[in-house]
Amino acid sequence: MNYAYPDEKGHYGIYGGRYVPETLMQSVLELEEAYKEAMEDEAFQKELNHYLKTYVGRETPLYFAENMTEYCGGAKIYLKREDLNHTGAHKINNTIGQALLAVRMGKKKVVAETGAGQHGVATATVCALLGLECVIFMGEEDVRRQKLNVFRMELLGAKVESVAAGSGTLKDAVNEALRYWVSHVHDTHYIMGSVLGPHPFPQIVRDFQSVIGKETKKQYEALEGKLPEAVVACIGGGSNAMGMFYPFVHDEEVALYGVEAAGKGVHTEKHAATLTKGSVGVLHGSMMYLLQNEEGQIQEAHSISAGLDYPGVGPEHSLLKDIGRVSYHSITDDEALEAFQLLTKKEGIIPALESSHAVAYALKLAPKMKEDEGLVICLSGRGDKDVESIKRYMEEV
């Protein structure tokens, strides 16, 4: 399969690109240049690997979920344990890389957006480590849902700005973070939390997250002497999925499954299934699939999981859908909750609600596969942050 994206203009087929105001163009080009240099610099790679190993705690285990496998029948189920990273999710793979890049570029301050608070915590963490000033924008609805993470960020020295505009969720936080970056561009680096935004952000985030898929490949081959038949990951903006899928893109014998949030159901208005129900448009500097109405107004995304309710999806996922290399599906709030409880009871592992969407789809897929086949789930984060809202949800039901 001939797959080499993005092109030199930052496009993934028709997707991606750089739809930014003139005031940001220079910074985006400067970032691209700095990133290219860093990727070719052995000292930078060495420093990044040092922190990934000694600070983040990589590599993360590939765990054979024996009880889940027995329960489902069919394929052997493996979990890539990104929940065991420092700060409890995959987000830090990207924030540590971008923070080192910020230091290299001589920036003193970092700005970021966050939905579930995981990216905010991971950003505040690396800023504390590297002595960078940190400002985090978070929608007020998410601030309410994720009180604990807000306090965590503040403990780490970050300034958390609550965003009341729009629906007070991730999309609005990104708007404000971009606005802040425009006016502080001389001394500030924007750490984008997912494979979104203008080029080179989708590529930078994908590359820093690719450590997930690279490790998985190596670990699975060591255990089973072959590649897995299927790989499953959840998708909001799509960074854990992109990090897991990208190293497998050329291995056409490996089926890749991306799982979006169907919320209350894709037939309702309350979902975040962008690739299932969306259409092409431009948001936050990039062309991609979006949830929008006929007039092109962005629709509110809904999911029980704060990390999946973004109304767009990364440009590379948009392309992978169109060329059929990845097959995209969606899982409802209720199905995700069921999977959350099942994994907790069967394996003693409490997954994030985001990751529970991937688990739920894998539960449907595994029984249709053969016993000598393998399925890997990207367990993108741990569920401590969700226990309170799950308790509330179950009491209401």
UniProtKB/Swiss-Prot annotation:
What EC number(s) has UniProt assigned to this enzyme?
A: 4.2.1.20
Q: What positions are modified (N6-(pyridoxal phosphate)lysine)? A: 91
Ranges annotated as spanning the membrane: none
Catalytic activity of the protein: (1S,2R)-1-C-(indol-3-yl)glycerol 3-phosphate + L-serine = D-glyceraldehyde 3-phosphate + L-tryptophan + H2O
The taxonomic lineage of its organism, from the top, reads: Bacteria, Bacillati, Bacillota, Bacilli, Bacillales
Establish whether keyword Lyase is in the entry. yes
Q: Which GO terms describe its molecular function?
A: tryptophan synthase activity
Question: GO cellular-component terms in the record?
Answer: cytoplasm
Protein name listed in UniProt: Tryptophan synthase beta chain
